Curated annotation (Swiss-Prot):
Cofactor dependency: pyridoxal 5'-phosphate
Family affiliation: Belongs to the class-I pyridoxal-phosphate-dependent aminotransferase family. LL-diaminopimelate aminotransferase subfamily.
Pathway: Amino-acid biosynthesis; L-lysine biosynthesis via DAP pathway; LL-2,6-diaminopimelate from (S)-tetrahydrodipicolinate (aminotransferase route): step 1/1
N6-(pyridoxal phosphate)lysine, modified sites: 238
Reactions catalysed according to its record: (2S,6S)-2,6-diaminopimelate + 2-oxoglutarate = (S)-2,3,4,5-tetrahydrodipicolinate + L-glutamate + H2O + H(+)
MF GO annotations: L,L-diaminopimelate aminotransferase activity; pyridoxal phosphate binding
Protein name: LL-diaminopimelate aminotransferase
Enzyme class: transferase
Primary role: Involved in the synthesis of meso-diaminopimelate (m-DAP or DL-DAP), required for both lysine and peptidoglycan biosynthesis. Catalyzes the direct conversion of tetrahydrodipicolinate to LL-diaminopimelate.
Name of the coding gene: dapL
The protein's assembly and partners: Homodimer.
GO BP terms: lysine biosynthetic process via diaminopimelate, diaminopimelate-aminotransferase pathway
Binding site for substrate: 13, 38, 102, 126, 176, 364
Length: 386
């Protein structure tokens, strides 16, 4: 049996090659420290686990869930956006729960694109923006993110011939992999740009609560007029260490929300109700849980920056996310650098090229192991480059 032709259009998955190399080194008995995947190394707070467990014992919670999300969770999301960002949302028309934000980001292209339509994709970026576009029959157009511009796309550089066929502009701030952040002025500019060119603006805000040094990421939807053209994806995965639970949501433009909801109704059955209720608890009690999580990430961030800069690396100082983005030393390409680092030290980092061609020359460290484990990894890296 042959697979669908559209799967052949997907770019090579570089991370699969990296996984094979890791397995090869592990087979040799080498100790491996994995700093490559953005999967928090901490479990969810006990209160969230307890909330989920209690709800699982209730028989009424084991049937099919509401397709668009239970009312309690949607009202918790409404309250969160109002109190955190000053954004008012209609829970019936402007909020949709997701099986993790990843599926929503992938499926928005299925709901919006026609064959040959163009989506504008930041480069480097989370691969699902591009891959979701391809799987929906669309064409991805790269928007370079350059360090000298703060890893912010230059929207005016997009050719008019491409804009006329465009449907979606994807953004992701705070940013993975670069850890860059966007100003409210940029958000305002992006909204006006999409209004002018009749484009849907999609911001992936999965890291909006992972921020340091008194920095407070803003919501795209806090810009006046944003809901006319924009939606924002969010997730409980990173904020509450719930990556395996698969609970996320999207808010904003009601026409885009409606289209995505219609598509999802035909391909999935929503999020398990006890997990939605646990997510409700997490949002309602976020002030109790988030500070300890941020404290751990800040300590790890500071440790990594100190070690890398002492070893001579050029490091982008993150205000947000749990990543550190640094330049590859010397003349090596990013994949061979990470391969060499793995074989010589046992430390796994992510090559920038895995996020797009404009990620070449960089590598990403995920702050997702304990501080002691991270210190060991940094000592190994610094010893190798001394």
């Amino acid at each position: 049996m042959q697979s669908a032709h559209r799967l052949n259009n997907l770019p090579p998955y570089l991370f699969a090659d990296l996984d094979k190399m890791v397995q090869k080194e592990q087979a040799k008995g080498k100790e491996i420290i994995k700093l490559g995947i953005g999967d928090p190394g901490m479990k969810p707070p006990e209160g969230i686990i307890k909330a989920a467990t209690q709800e699982m014992y209730k028989g009424e919670n084991h049937g099919y869930p509401a397709y668009d999300g239970i009312d309690k969770l949607k009202h918790a999301i409404k309250e969160y956006y109002q109190s955190r960002f000053g954004v008012e949302l209609n829970p019936d028309r402007e909020i949709l729960t997701l099986i993790g934000s990843k599926e929503g980001i992938a499926n928005i292209s299925q709901a919006i694109l026609n064959p040959g339509d163009i989506n504008f994709i930041p480069d480097p970026s989370y691969p699902v923006y591009k891959n979701g576009t391809i799987l929906a029959g669309g064409t991805p157009h790269s928007m370079p993110l350059k360090q000298d511009n703060g890893f912010i796309p230059e929207l005016e550089s997009i050719p008019q011939s491409r804009l006329s066929k465009g449907k979606i502009v994807f953004m992701n701030y705070p940013n993975n992999p670069t850890s860059a952040v966007a100003s409210k002025d940029f958000y305002s500019h992006a909204v006006k740009f999409c209004q002018k060119n009749k484009l849907l603006l999609c911001n992936d805000a999965a890291y909006s609560e992972i921020a340091f040094d008194d920095y407070q990421p803003q919501s795209l939807l806090s810009v006046p007029g944003a809901k006319e053209v924009a939606i924002e994806f969010n997730s409980l995965s990173k904020t509450f260490n719930m990556t395996g639970w698969r609970v996320g949501f999207v808010v904003g433009n009601e026409k885009a929300i409606s289209a995505l909801a219609k598509y999802k109704t035909n391909v999935d059955s929503g999020v398990f109700t006890p997990l939605q209720l646990a997510a409700t608890h997490a949002l309602e009690n976020r002030h109790e849980y988030i500070p300890d999580i941020l404290k751990a990430y800040k300590e790890r961030r500071d440790l990594v920056i100190e070690f890398l800069e002492e070893a001579g690396f050029h490091v982008y100082h993150p205000k947000a996310t749990f990543y550190v983005w640094a330049q590859v030393p010397g003349n090596q390409d990013s994949f061979n650098f990470t391969k060499s680092l793995l074989t010589k030290t046992g430390v796994v980092v992510t090559p920038g090229i895995g996020f797009g061609k404009h990620g070449e020359g960089y590598f990403r460290i995920a702050l997702t192991v304990t501080k002691d484990r991270l210190k060991t990894a940094m000592e190994k890296i610094c010893e190798y480059f001394s």
